From Swiss-Prot:
<keyword id="KW-0808">Transferase</keyword>
<keyword id="KW-0460">Magnesium</keyword>
<comment type="subunit">
    <text>Homodimer.</text>
</comment>
<feature type="binding site">
    <location>
        <position position="243"/>
    </location>
    <ligand>
        <name>Mg(2+)</name>
    </ligand>
</feature>
<feature type="binding site">
    <location>
        <position position="277"/>
    </location>
    <ligand>
        <name>Mg(2+)</name>
    </ligand>
</feature>
<dbReference type="InterPro" id="IPR002034">
    <property type="entry name" value="AIPM/Hcit_synth_CS"/>
</dbReference>
<feature type="domain" description="Pyruvate carboxyltransferase">
    <location>
        <begin position="28"/>
        <end position="302"/>
    </location>
</feature>
<comment type="similarity">
    <text>Belongs to the alpha-IPM synthase/homocitrate synthase family. LeuA type 2 subfamily.</text>
</comment>
<keyword id="KW-0963">Cytoplasm</keyword>
<keyword id="KW-0479">Metal-binding</keyword>
<protein>
    <recommendedName>
        <fullName>2-isopropylmalate synthase</fullName>
        <ecNumber>2.3.3.13</ecNumber>
    </recommendedName>
</protein>
<dbReference type="GO" id="GO:0009098">
    <property type="term" value="P:L-leucine biosynthetic process"/>
</dbReference>
<dbReference type="InterPro" id="IPR039371">
    <property type="entry name" value="LeuA_N_DRE-TIM"/>
</dbReference>
<dbReference type="Pfam" id="PF22615">
    <property type="entry name" value="IPMS_D2"/>
</dbReference>
<feature type="region of interest" description="Regulatory domain">
    <location>
        <begin position="434"/>
        <end position="539"/>
    </location>
</feature>
<dbReference type="GO" id="GO:0000287">
    <property type="term" value="F:magnesium ion binding"/>
</dbReference>
<comment type="pathway">
    <text>Amino-acid biosynthesis; L-leucine biosynthesis; L-leucine from 3-methyl-2-oxobutanoate: step 1/4.</text>
</comment>
């Protein structure tokens, strides 16, 4: 590798930058470019029918501005625009956006594609970066600026031929991120001089990181510099269009909003040229996780992610931020333990505050059952969580510790994730809940003189004992019968589910001589469960 081949992108000096001190308090104006920027990055571009399916999904999610394509680029793009308009598929509160280069015949064709539309954004652009000026177009700064001005005039002129529609004009200095910021301001100012926008009738100035060429903080500097040096800033909506070449498209967009941008263009799940466009899902959920309404309905990824995958033929990574299959799953034992404890303490009326889970998975229609999965990396908490969530077994800590090696052995033998059923079956087998070593035929329990008096019939034999409670009375009965002392170290019991027909489960931890044993039993009532659990340890 030869790093000396490269030079850093020059960005403006901004010693008094204000964006680091700002906080986001509301969602930006969203503009989906899935149907254009996303589509042009596909090896097999979408058909009209696929575009219509994606269009319906974008509308359902709540986008109010949707770039539908480059109608002058191909007949398919043109036909798609016509179908949306002629079949009345565009809701009254949704504005379509179209892309066009600053060339007259393309602009004319674009307006033909939009004839009869209620409202639309006409997005005209030309490149302004140094490398494009000098090596691609071989044009001077003055030439490029003149191209932008002429394009703006054509956009305005052809709009006047279609007064039945409401038009919004948008201009992009393509490769803004690699353009001298002063020059980008100069060109955009010249475009505004043509359009003469007002605070009540604003134009859109879109600032693309067509190729991400610097760190997010420096791109934010470019955006803040641009905004603070633009005349009539109140007459322009400042839009951001970032790409992910350095892996920072979302961060760059987020910091640009702090720098004063109003609007963000991107795609769902980040599909786009090279490494992709800015992922609107990630940015929207970032806002959501801080208590800001993203104004997009992303609550059921299992319904809309498959649509994106179907039309793009791109699978979503299991670790994709917020919506990947594995992002709310913990395998690490310490993580599982922290999650389990936090979920036990989390109250419905309190702000969400759970370790390792930045949002409540239920907000994205994910179940708690899928959060913790047991494998060889899991500790006692993972198995305990699964047994609690799936089978209503609230294991005491001493049962968790005792069962953990069993779960570990199963996971190592399985060589991967242990299914919930495998874990439950192992629990039943390990604590012999599938076998009755002692049959409880009957019992009588009474209280006299501050003591519990127990008469219990086991395998046809009657035992009697007394004590401070049921368990101590049974231990006394056992000692009277065998001469062996049994000490109850701990115990726990609970109903297996809500309702009058619920069974009970009891856990007892006992010591006989130097041996400690755990007994567990399920029964129709708590006392029966406690007796059978203790019997399972002393027989």
């Amino acid at each position: 590798m030869t790093p000396e081949k490269y030079r850093p992108t020059i960005t403006p000096d901004l010693p008094n930058r204000q964006w680091p001190n700002q906080r986001l308090t509301q969602a930006p104006i969203w503009a989906s470019v899935d149907l254009r920027d996303g589509n042009q990055a596909l090896a097999n571009p979408m058909t009209v029918e696929q575009k219509l399916k994606l269009w319906d999904q974008l509308v359902a999610i709540g986008f109010k501005t949707i770039e539908i394509g480059f109608p002058a680029a191909s007949q398919l793009e043109f036909d798609f625009a016509r179908r949306l308009i002629e079949e009345n598929r565009i809701p009254d509160d949704v504005t379509v956006q179209v892309l066009v280069q600053a060339r007259e015949h393309l602009i004319k064709r674009t307006y033909e594609a939009l004839q009869g539309v209620k409202q639309a954004v006409v997005h005209v652009y030309n490149t302004t970066s140094t490398v494009q000026r000098e090596k691609v177009f071989c044009k001077s700064k003055a030439d490029i600026k003149a191209m932008a001005i002429q394009g703006a005039k054509w956009v305005q002129s052809y709009a006047k031929e279609h007064p039945e529609s409401d038009w919004v004009f948008q201009y992009s200095p393509e490769s803004f991120s690699q353009t001298e910021t002063d020059y980008a301001v100069e060109v955009c100012q010249a475009v505004m001089d043509v359009w003469q926008p007002t605070p009540d009738n604003r134009c859109i100035l879109n600032l693309p990181a067509t190729v991400e060429s610097t760190s997010p903080n420096r791109f934010a500097d470019q955006v803040e510099y641009f905004i603070t040096h633009l005349k009539n800033r109140e007459s322009a909506i400042i839009s951001i269009h970032t790409h992910n070449d350095r892996g920072c498209a979302v961060a760059a967009a987020e910091l640009s909003l702090l720098a004063g941008a109003d609007r963000v263009e991107g795609t769902l799940l980040g599909n786009g040229e090279r490494t992709g466009n800015m992922d609107i899902v990630t940015l929207a959920m970032n806002l959501y996780s801080e208590g800001i309404d993203p104004e997009l309905n992303l609550s059921d990824p299992d319904s809309w992610v498959p649509v994106i995958e179907e039309v793009t033929k791109i699978d979503t990574h299991v670790r994709h931020p917020w919506v990947g299959e594995a992002v709310y799953t913990a395998y690490s034992g310490s993580h599982q333990d922290a999650i389990r404890k936090c979920l036990m303490r989390q109250k419905d009326d309190e702000p969400w505050n759970v370790a390792y889970l930045p949002i409540d998975p239920k907000d994205l229609n994910r179940s708690y059952e899928a959060i913790i999965r047991v494998n060889s990396q899991s500790g006692k908490a993972g198995a305990a969580f699964v047994l609690t969530q799936e089978y209503d077994l609230n294991l005491p800590k001493w049962v968790q510790q005792d069962f953990a090696p069993v779960a570990q052995t199963i996971a190592e033998q399985a060589g991967g994730i242990v299914s919930h059923q495998m874990l439950y079956d192992a629990f039943i087998q390990h604590y012999r809940l599938d076998k009755s070593l002692a049959e409880l035929n009957n019992y009588q329990l009474s209280r006299k003189e501050g003591k519990e008096h127990l008469s219990v019939e086991v395998n046809g034999e009657t035992w009697q004992g007394q004590g401070n409670g049921t368990l101590s009375a049974l231990c006394d009965a056992w000692q009277r019968r065998t001469g062996q002392q049994v000490d109850v170290l701990d115990y726990s019991e609970h109903a297996l589910h809500e309702g009058k027909d619920s069974k009970a489960i009891a856990y007892v931890y006992v010591q006989q001589k130097n041996t400690k044993t755990i007994g567990i039993a399920m029964a129709e009532d708590t006392v029966s469960a406690m007796i059978q659990a203790l019997l399972s340890t002393i027989r």
